[in-house]
């Protein structure tokens, strides 16, 4: 780089960085042009095009756009899209048909063919699909009428299985809501027909199947009175037992068996409580 002294002639009013510069008190600088207004030239300015400020370019190019000339008006586009109701119906129908096809298509080719036919039909006639779909709902209330055969088959098998698998009454204990006197009377009749020494184990019927006696459930009133008596005395004497049987319309044997079962239940509860408290020393 050339020395500054060789390029610029040093004048009396020139400032040199290496020299101390003193300004006299009476110097007048009003005639000199300002530094900001003085034109400055650069050696590389002719090689580059004139660049405008970014803000001006943005405003001129985007704020003054002729929308009608640059972007053509598309209008309502009736040829591309149908009405909103048809679009929603078509999407829902295609999703529903796809789900049904996944459900039935693996095991039944006829179901898959029916689902495809129904799907294709609704896509070709989208204008009438919105009215026909809601009017042609099948028996199940969800799927169209094409799936009534599967609905009938499924529920027919369910009804048949329930009828064939239904218990006969002597294998599984039943509990039907009825009044306490009727239950007690039926139990009393059963007890009267049975011998006293009959065991509670199931018996073998004539055809070789194991049968069981009809279970006589106790009513809430009977259980409440029996629990009250059990609270006062765990073991009941014969006199009190006969009195309870007459008051609750039960047999003497029923009252005796209930007290036996209740004592076993109480013993089990006490054993469980003892085990619980011994396993938790903090209690």
UniProtKB/Swiss-Prot annotation:
Organism ancestry = Eukaryota, Metazoa, Chordata, Craniata, Vertebrata
Molecular function (GO) terms listed? DNA-binding transcription factor activity, RNA polymerase II-specific; RNA polymerase II cis-regulatory region sequence-specific DNA binding
Q: Which domain of life is it from?
A: Eukaryota
- The name on file for this protein is Homeobox protein Hox-A11a
The UniProt entry, under InterPro entries, shows: DUF3528, HD, HD_metazoa, Homeobox_CS, Homeodomain-like_sf
Its localization reads: Nucleus
DNA-binding region range list: 211-270
**Region entry Disordered: which residue ranges?**
160-214
Q: What is the documented function of this protein?
A: Sequence-specific transcription factor which is part of a developmental regulatory system that provides cells with specific positional identities on the anterior-posterior axis.
**Entry similarity comment:** Belongs to the Abd-B homeobox family.
Q: Name one GO cellular component term.
A: nucleoplasm
Q: Which residue windows does the record flag with biased composition (Basic and acidic residues)?
A: 185-199
The entry's keywords: Developmental protein, DNA-binding, Homeobox, Nucleus, Transcription, Transcription regulation
Read off the SMART domains from this record: HOX
């Amino acid at each position: 780089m050339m020395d500054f002294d060789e390029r610029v002639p040093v004048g009396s009013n020139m400032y040199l960085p290496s020299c101390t510069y003193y300004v006299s008190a009476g110097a007048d600088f009003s005639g000199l042009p300002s530094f900001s207004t003085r034109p400055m030239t650069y050696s590389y300015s002719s090689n580059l095009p004139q660049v405008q400020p970014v803000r001006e370019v943005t405003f001129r190019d985007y704020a003054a756009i002729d929308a009608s000339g640059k972007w053509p008006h598309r209008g309502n586009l009736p040829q591309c899209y149908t009405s909103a109701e048809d679009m929603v119906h078509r999407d829902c129908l295609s999703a529903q048909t796809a789900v049904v096809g996944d459900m039935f298509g693996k095991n039944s080719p006829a179901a898959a063919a029916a689902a495809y036919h129904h799907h294709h039909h609704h896509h070709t006639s989208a204008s009438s699909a919105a009215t026909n779909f809601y009017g042609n709902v099948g028996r199940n209330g969800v799927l169209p009428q094409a799936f009534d055969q599967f609905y009938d088959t499924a529920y027919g098998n369910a009804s048949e299985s329930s009828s064939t698998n239904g218990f006969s009454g002597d294998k599984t204990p039943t509990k039907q809501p009825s009044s306490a006197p009727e239950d007690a009377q039926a139990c009393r009749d059963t007890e009267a027909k049975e011998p006293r020494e009959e065991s509670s184990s199931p018996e073998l019927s004539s055809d070789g199947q194991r049968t069981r006696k009809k279970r006589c459930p106790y009513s809430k009133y009977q259980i409440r009175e029996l629990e009250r008596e059990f609270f006062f005395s765990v073991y009941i004497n014969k006199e009190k037992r006969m009195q309870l049987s007459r008051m609750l319309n039960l047999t003497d044997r029923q009252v005796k068996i209930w007290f036996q079962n209740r004592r076993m239940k109480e013993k089990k509860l006490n054993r469980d409580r003892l085990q619980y408290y011994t396993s938790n020393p903090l209690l």
